[in-house]
């Protein structure tokens, strides 16, 4: 039986948000509609939807049947109920795993509210309609559960809106739905001129939900906003710590539980610092905090008057965190293989461009504060479990904006997701072969190796710990695009250094280069909100311009292997210069100059789509579902 995580959680009551499906009374239509409109305006203050009594489903049955078909909706399966990784755990860790899953699923409910205020009430509406036999609602629910929300881009960069008339907002669910950029800036300017500096600082930090109060905006810390949910999570983490067999892991769980109970960023910092030291633990638990989704906060650097006031008052704007939960079992063999790179991190730091002009998380002459594990996944929830065109392959956390890095001199930790990266079915391998045949010069096929993609990812994640540690906030909405671009180019630019040092063989070097190039080809031009996909277009354009790659008029990729690393080095140098300057206009120019979709890229995209129909994906978590029953 599949357990719905949101409905499972004890104490959750969504009845007050539920949309009635009873027919509207026919009397006084005009008056009631006017009242609804006024209530809608008022509801914008706290992101509560009053609106119409019924939602209108946006996708037709034909479109839903297509998008939920297995050819279009791929599946990533987390650990099975009888997985040996689970069965081999000690009993105390098995018991702890139950509580970790119960804690993690709370973040589905929390993050849906951060994402869009319609998410939870629409979920309730769908469930009510499904109980009446509504097939359109049933198929819509499959997509809703996959993308964990009402709005999502697919792999072809089409915005999929499940509710008619409901679109994604730049401020997602962390800002009032009617707040536009110009008004946002004007309110902040007035508040700063009125001396409300602390209030503005809270609005522009990464851990608050912003609401209207009169003509101003007020921020509420996540811990206070979701007090009951976080208290439930804390209780489950404390229960897990009672039976888990690893003392270090238990210490982290207790620290994280404290941080969930009190709105104090330093409590999170202590938990983060401990988490980043975890290396030899049986279990994995993370509250992921990433800020790729918020498109409103960092627009403040685009307004000269507002930017000057922020600088004058020492306020650094940081995009809002969106929250996810990761529960897993550490794979020792995979972890040992990944750990081999740790010895080379100082060498990589030493070979960074302009290394003497900034501070890095990894020091060229000291032991690195970087741990890394390979995890067999039991559950991915909230932000890290969303399948929106793609799904998270690995993470290097905490990010540089977190206090454990800035105030406590803590380290970082890489977690790699085995169930998401591994190609296990023959069907998937056959699709991969067809894609290669349709898009890559046959002479290069010998070098394509899906395991090489994992090693490129290892380089990418460690790349986040290299380069300027701070000072990039002024890049605004381009900061994330430039950062993920930097991480990619570090992975590629360091190949010759690492091959010479013995980490890779010459054959592995070629495999990483060709596999990177083949996998970097896109099915469509993305939107600027898709940082990870924008960087791919930028790189493809840059490498083609430099003669390291070529796409024929027929859409076939050719790679000049020996030009790839020097080209990556050149691009990395340019990226580091942009990051060091931290200037919005320079960052914007760099992105837009290279974010060019050529006719050859479009031909390539059409070739890919002929052999791969996939538009999105979903996650299945059989072991997690079973643990939620117990």
Language-model segments: which ranges?
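N-terminal helix-rich structural modules
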Residues: 56-256, 271
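Low-complexity, intrinsically disordered export/secretion signals at extreme N-termini
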Residues: 1-62
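Extended, compositionally biased alpha-helical segments that mediate assembly or anchoring
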Residues: 577-630
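Contiguous, non-catalytic segments that form substrate-binding/exosite surfaces or channel walls
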Residues: 224-441, 449
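Active-site recognition of the HExxH zinc-binding catalytic motif
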Residues: 90, 455-469, 487, 492
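Long, well-structured alpha-helical subdomains associated
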Residues: 492-594
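An active-site-proximal "capping" alpha-helix that borders the catalytic cofactor pocket
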Residues: 246, 480-497
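Post-HEXXH active-site segment of zinc metalloproteases
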Residues: 468-485
């Amino acid at each position: 039986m599949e357990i719905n995580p949101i409905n499972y959680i004890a104490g959750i009551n969504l009845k007050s948000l539920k949309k009635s499906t009873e027919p509207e009374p026919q009397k006084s239509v005009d008056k009631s509609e006017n009242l609804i409109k006024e209530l809608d305006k008022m509801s914008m203050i706290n992101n509560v939807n009053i609106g119409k009594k019924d939602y209108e489903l946006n996708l037709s049955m034909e479109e839903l049947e297509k998008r939920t078909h297995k050819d279009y909706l791929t599946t990533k399966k987390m650990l099975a109920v009888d997985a040996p990784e689970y069965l081999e755990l000690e009993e105390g860790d098995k018991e702890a795993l139950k509580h970790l899953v119960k804690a993690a699923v709370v973040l589905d409910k929390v993050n849906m509210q951060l994402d869009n205020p319609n998410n939870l009430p629409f979920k309730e509406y769908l469930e009510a309609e499904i109980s009446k036999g509504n097939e359109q609602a049933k198929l819509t629910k499959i997509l809703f559960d996959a993308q964990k929300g009402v709005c999502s881009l697919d792999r072809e960069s089409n915005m999929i809106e499940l509710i008619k008339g409901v679109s994604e907002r730049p401020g997602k669910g962390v800002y009032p739905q009617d707040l536009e950029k110009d008004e946002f800036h004007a309110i902040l300017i007035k508040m700063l001129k009125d001396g409300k500096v602390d209030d503005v600082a809270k609005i522009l930090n990464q851990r608050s939900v912003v609401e209207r109060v009169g003509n101003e905006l007020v921020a509420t810390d996540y811990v206070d906003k979701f007090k009951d949910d976080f208290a439930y999570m804390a209780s489950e983490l404390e229960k897990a710590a009672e039976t888990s067999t690893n003392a270090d892991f238990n210490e982290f769980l207790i620290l994280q539980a404290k941080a969930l109970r009190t709105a104090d960023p330093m409590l999170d910092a202590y938990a983060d610092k401990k988490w980043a030291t975890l290396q030899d633990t049986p279990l994995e638990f993370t509250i992921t905090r990433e800020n790729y989704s918020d498109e409103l906060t960092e627009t403040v650097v685009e307004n000269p008057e507002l930017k000057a006031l922020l600088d004058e008052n020492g306020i650094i704007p940081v995009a809002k965190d969106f929250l996810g939960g990761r529960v897993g079992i550490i794979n020792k063999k995979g972890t040992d293989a990944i750990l081999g790179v740790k010895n080379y991190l100082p060498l990589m730091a030493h070979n960074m461009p302009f290394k003497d002009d900034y501070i890095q998380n990894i020091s060229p002459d000291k032991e690195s504060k970087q741990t890394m594990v390979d995890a067999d996944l039991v559950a991915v929830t909230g932000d890290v479990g969303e399948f929106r065109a793609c799904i998270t392959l690995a993470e290097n956390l905490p990010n540089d904006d977190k206090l454990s890095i800035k105030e406590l001199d803590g380290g970082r930790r890489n977690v790699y997701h085995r169930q998401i990266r591994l190609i296990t079915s023959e069907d998937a391998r056959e699709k991969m072969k067809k894609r290669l045949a349709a898009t890559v010069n046959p002479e290069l096929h010998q070098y394509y190796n899906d395991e090489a993609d994992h090693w490129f990812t290892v380089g990418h994640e460690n790349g986040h710990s290299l380069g300027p540690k701070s000072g990039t906030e002024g890049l605004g909405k381009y900061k994330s695009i430039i950062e993920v671009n930097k991480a990619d180019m570090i992975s590629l630019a360091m190949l010759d250094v690492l091959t010479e040092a013995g980490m890779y063989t010459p054959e592995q070097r070629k495999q990483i280069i060709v596999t990177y190039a083949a996998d970097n080809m896109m099915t469509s031009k993305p939107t600027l909100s898709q940082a990870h996909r924008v960087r791919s277009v930028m790189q493809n354009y840059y490498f083609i311009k430099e003669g390291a790659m070529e796409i024929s008029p027929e859409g076939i990729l050719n790679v000049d292997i020996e030009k790839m690393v020097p080209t990556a080095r050149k691009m990395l140098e340019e990226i580091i210069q942009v990051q060091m300057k931290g200037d919005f206009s320079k960052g914007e120019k760099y992105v837009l100059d290279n974010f060019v979709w050529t006719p050859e890229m479009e031909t390539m995209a059409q070739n890919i789509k002929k052999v791969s129909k996939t538009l999105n994906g979903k996650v299945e978590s059989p072991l997690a579902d079973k643990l939620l029953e117990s």
